[in-house]
Amino acid sequence: MSCHNCSRTALGLFIRSLTNIQPAFAACRPLIHPQSLRFLSDARRPRRVDQSASRPDGVKPDTEIEDELSGEGFPRKRERPAWAIQKEALKEKLGGEAWNPRKKLSPDTMEGIRHLNSTQPDKFTTPVLAEHFKVSPEAIRRILKSNWKPSDKEYEERMERWNKRGERIWSNLVEMGVKPPKRWRDMGVGRARNGDVPRWKSRERNLVDVKDSASSDFTEYIPDEDIIPTVGKESKSKPTTSSIPLSERL
């Protein structure tokens, strides 16, 4: 029995050697799995596929994408930034016109607008007031409709700011030889020190052209208080009295 098994094993080994089959002891060897390389070469490095070459001509990447199942094209949704949405809404609101920010009027100016319209409504109409104060007619209509009045504390603070502003402006005009009104002289504006003559009494007086902020349409309007003047932009000095001949002065 053992001789038969030995002859059969020897015959099997002989046949395997002729047919280039793996040796009989190959199954007993440990299997060694090849390890992956730590660093990839240029040949094995993954490359990014360029989709522009496979895209058909005339199709933009962000416009339409064709559905493979239905065969219909649908637009790709892209979120727009907030500033772009606001810009488009503002453009539609303005009707294509340029952006012109609103001019902020002081409470005293708005009160003066209401006073002008109430005293002479035929002369100081809404278009005239809008043209003079450089605001829209709709803003003038809202000012005329409003009945807001400041409190006593707000009125006192506003008058204090107004007096400081007028004192600062008239102090600068005194240095240019302009005589301040009696109200500001009583407050000490233009008062000379150490017995000197005020500048508005010297030869260097009235060197600038001073006018109020009202135009020709407002010449007949008599304000309740003094108007703070503005200096003309022409930078032309007015002739002094000493340079005018006596015959012309008389």
From Swiss-Prot:
Its main location: mitochondrion. It is found in: Mitochondrion. Residues 43-80, 225-250 are annotated as: Disordered. Residues 238-250 have a biased composition (Polar residues). Keywords: Mitochondrion, Transit peptide. Residues 1-40 form a transit peptide. It holds the Pfam family Neugrin. GO terms for cellular component: mitochondrion; nucleus. It comes from the Eukaryota. Belongs to the RRG9 family. Required for respiratory activity and maintenance and expression of the mitochondrial genome. This is Required for respiratory growth protein 9, mitochondrial. It comes from Pyrenophora tritici-repentis (strain Pt-1C-BFP) (Wheat tan spot fungus). The lineage of its organism: Eukaryota, Fungi, Dikarya, Ascomycota, Pezizomycotina. The gene is rrg9.
